[in-house]
Curated annotation (Swiss-Prot):
Protein name: Alcohol dehydrogenase 2
UniProt keyword Oxidoreductase, yes or no: yes
Lineage: Eukaryota, Metazoa, Ecdysozoa, Arthropoda, Hexapoda
PANTHER family membership: 15-HYDROXYPROSTAGLANDIN DEHYDROGENASE [NAD(+)], ALCOHOL DEHYDROGENASE-RELATED
Annotated NAD(+) binding sites: 9-33
UniProt KW NAD keyword: yes
EC number: 1.1.1.1
Superkingdom in the source lineage: Eukaryota
Summary of subunit composition and partner proteins: Homodimer.
Binding site for substrate: S137
Similarity comment: Belongs to the short-chain dehydrogenases/reductases (SDR) family.
Primary gene name: ADH2
Enzyme class name: oxidoreductase
């Protein structure tokens, strides 16, 4: 799905990977670009707008842990431009010391945002179809002992995305669901692995993981922008050490209705 002339929302667009992806997306000649974030960075929004005057950039102060904030922000988009064509769910934290906050931001907030946006995008309701890209992690595909809580939240994102990305739903709504899994990337989130791990026992392996080779956020952001345009329902992609690769998950069980 080309993004030219489309209306796009990026939740968490002012983070490191998110902002790099935003810069890439601004080259796509979108009609409008809505950046939802708890961070307030007016200079970054101005810089985005300067990249392409053809795309109208909006900033919305956004609390992903609040259903009312989610509902109000999405309603504002529809009131301004009528249609939502693409939603990127990119808000996330890594702090295993706070289980509730990790789950509320990384998983529950993502679920609530998706479920609120989907009817607005559904071609049989208010929308014209589109794509939802949920940002999980390589730690949503494989376990990571020093970040067990973060890992659980991202496994949840993976399970949710694969479930609502079933062809049954896509054929009805016209909304594709794609999952994007960054590997270790040079961001403050990655640095938290070395200090906000699950147990005290985790310190040694956390430090070892923190010293693993990483990729630049610019590279990961470019990969994310590429995945948004793929519009491949059910697609799962890993961005790791500078390479973007599609993932085919192992299937151990299938529901009988398939």
């Amino acid at each position: 799905m080309g993004l030219s002339g489309k209306n796009v929302i990026f939740v968490g667009g002012l983070g490191f990977i998110g902002y790099e992806a935003c810069k890439q997306l601004m080259a796509k000649n979108m009609a409008s670009f809505f950046v939802f974030d708890v961070l307030d960075k007016p200079e970054d929004i101005k810089a985005l707008q300067a990249l392409n005057p053809k795309t109208k950039v909006y900033y919305t102060k956004f609390d992903i842990t609040s259903k009312q904030s989610i509902k109000s922000a999405l309603a504002d988009v529809v009131s301004k431009v009528k249609y939502i064509d693409a939603l990127i769910n990119g808000a996330g934290i890594l702090t295993d010391l706070n289980v509730e906050l990790t789950m509320n931001i990384n998983l529950i907030g993502l679920i609530n945002t998706t479920l609120e946006a989907l009817p607005l995008m559904d071609k049989n309701k208010q929308g014209r179809g589109g794509v939802i890209v949920n940002i999980a992690s390589v730690l949503g595909l494989e376990p990571c002992p020093p970040a067990a809580v973060y890992c659980a939240s991202k496994f949840g994102v993976m399970g949710f995305s694969r479930s609502i990305g079933d062809p049954y739903y896509y054929n009805i709504t016209g909304v594709a669901v794609v999952t994007f899994c960054p590997g270790l990337t040079e961001t403050p989130l990655k640095n938290n692995i070395g200090s906000k791990y699950t147990f005290e026992y985790s310190k040694k392996i956390s430090e070892e993981l923190n010293n693993t080779k990483t990729q630049k956020p610019e590279v990961c952001g470019a990969h994310l922008a590429q995945v948004v345009e793929s519009h491949e329902n059910g697609g799962i992609y890993i961005s790791n050490q500078g390479t973007l690769a599609k993932v085919t998950p192992t299937v151990y069980w299938q529901p009988t209705y398939h």
